[in-house]
Amino acid sequence: MAKQDSFTSDEWTLLRLAPSLVAGATTAADPSGIFASIKEAAAGAGVVSNAFKTNTGLELFAALATDHSIPGMPDPKTLLGEGSREQQLEKFKNAVLERVKSATDLVARKASAGEADAYRKMLADVAEKAADASKEGGFLGFGGVRVSDKEQAFISEVKRAAGVT
C-alpha cells in the first residue's frame, strides 16, 4: 500500500496532475468550444472524485483524496512546444501520454497491484467520460456525435499508455 511519503515530491505531483492532464488532452484531441471544454473538464474531475470515493480502502487513493494542496503545473512550453496550433495540440497529447505512462509505471513500482489497477482505470475513465461529456461536430447542440473519431483514438492511446486492456 502506497502513501504520499512513498513518492518524491515530483512523483506525487505527477500522480496528482495526470488525471487533469488526461482530461485536457482529451478535449484537445478534438476541440469544440469553451462550453464543451468546461463540460469535459468537469466530467474528468467527476471521475477522479468518484475514484476517490470508491477506492477509499486503498491507501494511495486515500492519500490523493486528502491532499488539498495545489500542485505546480508543468511549464506550458514543455507541454506545447513551438509550431502551429495543430502541432502544439499534437505535442500536448504526446506529452500527456508520456506522463500517463510514467505515472502508471511509477504506481506499478511503488504501490500495490490493486492500487495500480485502480489508478490505471481512473486515467482511462477520465478520458472516456471527458470525451462523452459533450457532442462534437454539431451546431448549437443539434447533430454531432457524442465521441468523435479523434477522441476515440486518443482514448485508445491513453488506455495503451496506461496499460489498460
Please place each PLM-identified region on the residue numbering.
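Small-residue-enriched hydrophobic alpha-helices in membranes
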Residues: 1-165
